[in-house]
């Protein structure tokens, strides 16, 4: 077998609040790299505090790409991400730099590194119909429906993951073909790079939960609710008939803040709901990450030396 001549890239993956941003910046500084965000919330302008978007000081330490691409009333698909990220990575490599892919959106990573199956575009009317059904019957009932038409998808998609349940049923109702079958079809080619996948996750789940809670409290102190109030006050957002159906507003934390500002519950309940939703997101992310069999796992707080060794070995090949 010949030597693999593909350019190198490093993927910094992990659940929310696991320290990906700090690690990505450190690697970019060490390896003369540039960071490519792989996060579906960070593509939206005005979603800064609640998305833990790198701030000006962090961006000054290393170039960042694919932040602030869309307004929050717009949409951005995995296919658009794969095309944009591919162009950015090719440009970074052409300039002799190291691409550092950093984020926690599994669909974006799969689209970029494994290729993307052809798939029908999102249909706002169908999504609204499914959301109305869910409001009446509950997402568990729609998950049971998915299990009847696409058992493989229902096994992969947790009953508490409404966004993916909605997408799977949307694809089936639009085309009559299960999403699992669509995913088997050849589509967009994967990015031609050799990638070291680093997964950051505390060994103790309780530590991650503590980090999630502390980070959310810090976001509140930084003015997260004022950020959401400003979003709601934008004329373009006010004109949206069902803002809770927008991908930007469905982002964890933002949905709970939006509902709270709509008058649902008190401040303590809002905080509890947002922290719970973030923990559920982390759980789903860890489930996806366990399927990344070619990745290496590190606790960012105690495995720094081992992580540095893995990176050194990879770039020296």
Swiss-Prot record:
It catalyses: adenosine(37) in tRNA + dimethylallyl diphosphate = N(6)-dimethylallyladenosine(37) in tRNA + diphosphate. GO terms for molecular function: ATP binding; tRNA dimethylallyltransferase activity. The keyword Metal-binding does not apply. Its cofactor is Mg(2+). ATP binds at residues 14-21. GO terms for biological process: tRNA modification. The record marks 105, 127 as: Interaction with substrate tRNA. Residues 39-42, 163-167 are annotated as: Interaction with substrate tRNA. Its EC number is 2.5.1.75. Substrate binds at residues 16-21. Monomer. Belongs to the IPP transferase family. This is tRNA dimethylallyltransferase. It comes from Stenotrophomonas maltophilia (strain R551-3).
């Amino acid at each position: 077998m010949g030597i693999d001549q593909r350019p190198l890239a490093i993927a910094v993956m992990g659940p929310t609040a696991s320290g990906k941003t700090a690690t990505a910046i450190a690697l970019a500084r060490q390896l003369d790299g540039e960071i490519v965000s792989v996060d579906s919330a960070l593509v939206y302008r005005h979603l800064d505090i609640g998305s833990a978007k790198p701030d000006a000081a962090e961006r000054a330490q290393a170039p960042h790409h694919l932040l602030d691409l869309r307004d929050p009333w717009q949409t951005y698909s995995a296919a658009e991400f794969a095309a944009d990220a591919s162009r950015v990575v090719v440009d970074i490599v052409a300039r002799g730099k190291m691409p550092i892919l950093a984020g926690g959106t599994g669909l974006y990573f799969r689209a970029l590194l494994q290729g993307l199956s052809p798939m029908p575009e999102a249909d706002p009317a169908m999504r609204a119909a499914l959301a109305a059904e869910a409001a009446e019957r509950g997402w568990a009932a729609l998950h049971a429906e998915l299990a009847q038409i696409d058992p493989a998808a229902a096994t992969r998609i947790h009953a508490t993951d409404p966004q993916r349940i909605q997408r799977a049923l949307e694809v089936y109702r639009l085309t009559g073909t299960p999403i699992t079958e669509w995913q088997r079809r050849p589509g967009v080619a994967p990015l031609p790079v050799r990638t070291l996948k680093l997964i950051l996750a505390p060994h103790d789940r309780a530590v991650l939960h503590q980090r999630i809670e502390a980070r959310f409290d810090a976001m509140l102190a930084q003015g997260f609710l004022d950020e959401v109030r400003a979003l709601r006050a934008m004329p373009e957002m006010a004109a949206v008939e069902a803002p809770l159906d927008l991908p930007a507003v469905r982002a964890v934390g933002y949905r709970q803040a939006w509902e709270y500002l709509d008058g649902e519950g008190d401040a303590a309940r809002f905080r509890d709901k947002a922290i719970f939703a973030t923990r559920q997101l982390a759980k789903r992310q860890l489930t996806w990450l366990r399927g990344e069999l070619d990745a290496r796992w590190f606790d960012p707080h105690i495995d720094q030396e081992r992580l540095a060794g893995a990176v050194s070995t990879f770039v020296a090949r």
